[in-house]
Amino acid sequence: MLRAPGSDAPPTLSVRIAAAAGAACLADMITFPLDTAKVRLQIQGEGQGQPPRAPRYRGVLGTVATLARTEGLQKLYSGLPAGLQRQVGFASLRIGLYDSVREWLSPGQGAAASLGSRISAGVMTGGAAVFIGQPTEVVKVRLQAQSHLHGRKPRYTGTYNAYRIIATTEGLTGLWKGTTPNLMRNVIINCTELVTYDLMKEALVKNHLLADDLPCHFLSALVAGFCTTVLSSPVDVVKTRFVNSVPEQYTSVPNCAMTMLTKEGPLAFFKGFVPSFLRLGSWNVIMFVCFEQLKRELMKSGRTVDCAT
């Protein structure tokens, strides 16, 4: 990515990691209700040997309103602690390391990065982040998906209770359940999100359409969010279904995908598309805008400290 405006030196690795973690956590806190709505829409219609029922949730705003009315406003933020834990370890790596890995893969010092090196950087940083952050993803999805309606006893009472119960009843491997679809999803997301943002921002600045500032960051992030949602939705739905499933409901990730296809049709793979885009689009805008600003401010702070000493 291009260096922050007004900066003579590119952001250091520690600045990029800290800025990525902070920006991702802020974006998560603001958009989390949309993510919860997306999860509920994705698991709707998931049969467990029961006759089909009329949909409870209709559309993203309807889902948010239904959850707030029937389960309380706090339900919209169920799983947020795990979500923030996830971003600290996950986003800081996949976003914070992207520039460094891309530069390492580029042919020479100061040479323009090729599309291949950008994609490879997205694959490597996204894949590494998934293995580290998967337990937090499992807990987040489980807490978002569970309902307290109709006298159902919740599977988990809180974030750390969920970690303990999953590890106890399903083994440590239960905390890495769904790693394969999540790896596929996040490789797609990381490549599309970061590479699209990188290329869009570079094109806008180099062609003098926009300066490297807020409007450029906003537009680049919005385009990246839409492209990412289109490509990642099918894998995201399968990942959510598989991670949330009870033991032995699906024998494997392909079995989960085939069950969805045969019972619900191909459109099931795009369930929750609108909330996914609203969430990813808004998440991208908030995260990238904050990421750029945090990098700039952290570099300024570092230079101020250096001058003072």
From Swiss-Prot:
Protein's name in the database: Mitochondrial brown fat uncoupling protein 1
Family: Belongs to the mitochondrial carrier (TC 2.A.29) family.
UniProt GO molecular function: cardiolipin binding; long-chain fatty acid binding; oxidative phosphorylation uncoupler activity; purine ribonucleotide binding
Gene: UCP1
InterPro entries: Mit_carrier, Mito_Metabolite_Transporter, Mitochondrial_sb/sol_carrier, Mt_carrier_dom_sf
Gene Ontology cellular component list: mitochondrial inner membrane
Transmembrane segments: 11-32, 76-98, 119-135, 181-197, 215-234, 269-291
Main location, first listed in the record: mitochondrion
Subunit structure and binding partners: Most probably functions as a monomer. Binds one purine nucleotide per monomer. However, has also been suggested to function as a homodimer or a homotetramer. Tightly associates with cardiolipin in the mitochondrion inner membrane; may stabilize and regulate its activity.
Protein location: Mitochondrion inner membrane
